[in-house]
Every structure is written in structure tokens, then in C-alpha cells.
Regions:
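Formylglycine-dependent sulfatase
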Residues: 2-14, 18-267
Length: 267
């Protein structure tokens, strides 16, 4: 299925940043939608946002060809509330998520209300295939698992953050799932989510299904753990950079490269 772009929307925020890209099939059927959310990206850590020590050409392209929103507010600029607001269009506290959702009661600040209507539920009712690839962080158990909140397909991470981008563990636990089955994939999380997204897009295109894909990367959230070769490239380019900054730049540039691969698969 050949795809033509018809709309492009870019969103950015200091604590969480996202981009949405929509496309139409040649016969002008209902558009496919790709919504990308990244985690803990600083507002100034993109070259389109005037950063001088890094390059993010693929994200820049979305900003340049889409709608750029420079004056807006995040009601609660941390992980779970941002995701609840994005998926429902509501103030996060109104759907039960004023703060971060965690499994331990003494550190938990929310419960995603089962009655809240989500974007994938609405789109699914409109004939879309719906998928979440990447980070969920809106619940660990029923009735708040991705497949119960509007997603036909889930391939990703249930929890809040990874302690290691390669083992994908959080405090010793494994939260990587394919739908309701625990999995233990090998590889850097950013690259896994990209590969799974490209495969999903190709599959739905082949079957000519209109799809909504919500791609939620963990990057560039800590730990600062990009592939070593990406750190080496940054340090070779600018030997004066502090090690921590070089790692963050490498993690962001690696993320941008992978976003480019997903967008290319649409085109």
C-alpha cells in the first residue's frame, strides 16, 4: 500500500515530548495515524529548538513541516499524567492520574479510571486497528492493561522506567510484554521499539488496514545508556563535552535516527 502524507503534527514539552504523523492511502481512505511520544526530553535538547551541540534532523523535519506549538502547559509534567492526558484529552487528575503510577502503595500517585474513554477506543470503534509499541505506564494489572484500554496489539514495556536499556529490567522485574505474554527480548530498547513498529506498519499496510500506532519510547529518560558507538561519535565530534552530556546527546541522536527509520517505513 503506497502512502502519501497529508498531515504532520509536532508537539514538544520540557518533560515529555511527542510527535504525530498522519498519512492517507492513495484512494483517500481514512488516514493512518502514527503518534510518537518520547520520555523526559528537554525542550532545548533538539537542534530545531536551538541546541548547538547535537543534531536531530528527523525530529526537526517534523517540526519544520508540521504545526509547532510554542505556548502551552502540561498540567502534570511527569510520566503517567502526561500519558493519561494524551490518550484521553482530559486533565490527568480527572481520570485518576494526578501523579506517577507505581506498584508500591506508599509511592503510588494514581489509578487510571476504568471509565475514562481513550483515543484508541474511539479510533477502534471507527474501524482502525490500534497498537501500542513501547512504554505504557498507566497500570500493571487488569483492568488497566493496554489490551483492555483500546489497543488490539501491545508490544512493549508496562512499567515506569528501565534500569537498563539492554536487560529492560525495573528493580529486578521484567515488564516487557507481547500482549498478555511476558517476553525477554535482546537488544537496546529504542532499537527494539523501532523494529517492532516498522514490522507493524508493514504488516498493516500489506493487509490494507487503517491503523493507529502509538509509539512510546523510553528514551531519553535515564539511565543515560546509548549504544557505545553513538557515544564515541559524539565524543569524536566534540572532545570538550562532559561525559554525561555526551551520553545524553548520543541517546537523543540515537533516538532521532530510529524515529527516522519509522517515518521512512511510512513513506
Amino acid at each position: 500500500m503506497k502512502i502519501e502524507k497529508t498531515a504532520l503534527l509536532a508537539l514538544g514539552a520540557a518533560m515529555a515530548s511527542g510527535a504525530a504523523l498522519a498519512s492517507n492511502t492513495v484512494d483517500k481512505a481514512i488516514p493512518n495515524v502514527l503518534l510518537i511520544l518520547v520520555d523526559d526530553l528537554g525542550l532545548g535538547d533538539l537542534s530545531c529548538q536551538y541546541a548547538k551541540d547535537l543534531s536531530t534532523p528527523n525530529i526537526d523535519r517534523i517540526f519544520e513541516t508540521g504545526v509547532r506549538l510554542d505556548n502551552f502547559y502540561a498540567n502534570s509534567s511527569v510520566s503517567s499524567p502526561s500519558r493519561a492526558a494524551l490518550l484521553t484529552g482530559c486533565f490527568p487528575a480527572m481520570v485518576g492520574v494526578p501523579g506517577v503510577i507505581r506498584p508500591s502503595i506508599d509511592q503510588n500517585w494514581g489509578y487510571f479510571g476504568p471509565s475514562a474513554v481513550t483515543m484508541p477506543e474511539v479510533l477502534k470503534n471507527g474501524g482502525y486497528r490500534t497498537a501500542l509499541i513501547g512504554k505504557w505506564h498507566l497500570g500493571w494489572e487488569s483492568p488497566n492493561l493496554p489490551n483492555e484500554r483500546g489497543f488490539d496489539h501491545f508490544h512493549g514495556f508496562l512499567a515506569d522506567m528501565m534500569d537498563d536499556y539492554y536487560t529492560h529490567r525495573r528493580q529486578g522485574g521484567n515488564y516487557m510484554y507481547l500482549n498478555d505474554k511476558e517476553i525477554d527480548p535482546k537488544g537496546h530498547a529504542t532499537e527494539l521499539f523501532t523494529s517492532w513498529s516498522v514490522d507493524y506498519i508493514k504488516k498493516e499496510a500489506k493487509e490494507k488496514n487503517p491503523f493507529f500506532l502509538y509509539l512510546a519510547y523510553n528514551a531519553p529518560h535515564s539511565p543515560l545508556q546509548p549504544p557505545v558507538e553513538w557515544v564515541n561519535k559524539v565524543q569524536e565530534r566534540d572532545k570538550s563535552l562532559p561525559v554525561k552530556r555526551a551520553r545524553l546527546i548520543a541517546l537523543i541522536e540515537h533516538l532521532d535516527y530510529n524515529i527516522g527509520k519509522v517515518i521512512q517505513s511510512l513513506e
